[in-house]
């Protein structure tokens, strides 16, 4: 998935109110960018970090920049826009690029199911059981090479696990897919110390048949590409 508009570099001044970030452009101007990430963004919102923004000229949007990436001092990137994983995965699923799902002929996004929820992707094929895929963006890393989820308590994520488990018990295929939006991680673990309830609910869901799939990404200022399956 390529970014529709070329990204521009900037320096983060501060993130606040979760969805706002003040940044300094290379020409010295200070602007406010939209931060499409409701999480804590632990380790990703320190003043002085190099970030990449996507400009827009949409008259309906008050903020003319969207925060897309963090560039670390080691040259690696982290994607901070939580809408990117679904867009990148939709393209990969439709192109049958993910082996675990390649046999499914139809991909539907945001389908109603469960308790007033929407599943990220419903995969169907006449010869296969329905496959419900819930996607989580993974950006936390507290140890070199190890990506973790979640970065804050997520009651919503716990609810999604219960709903996936119900689909598995009903005879459908149910997959919890963690997309690692970091290029410096090759392993994954649940951050049970941050949200023990989520970790416990995952074990319950897994015992009921919910699969866990962790996929890496290749990230540059040009775009995000779905990568390899990572150990977890």
From Swiss-Prot:
<dbReference type="GO" id="GO:0003677">
    <property type="term" value="F:DNA binding"/>
</dbReference>
<dbReference type="InterPro" id="IPR040452">
    <property type="entry name" value="SfsA_C"/>
</dbReference>
<dbReference type="Pfam" id="PF03749">
    <property type="entry name" value="SfsA"/>
</dbReference>
<dbReference type="Pfam" id="PF17746">
    <property type="entry name" value="SfsA_N"/>
</dbReference>
<dbReference type="InterPro" id="IPR005224">
    <property type="entry name" value="SfsA"/>
</dbReference>
<comment type="similarity">
    <text>Belongs to the SfsA family.</text>
</comment>
<dbReference type="InterPro" id="IPR041465">
    <property type="entry name" value="SfsA_N"/>
</dbReference>
<protein>
    <recommendedName>
        <fullName>Sugar fermentation stimulation protein homolog</fullName>
    </recommendedName>
</protein>
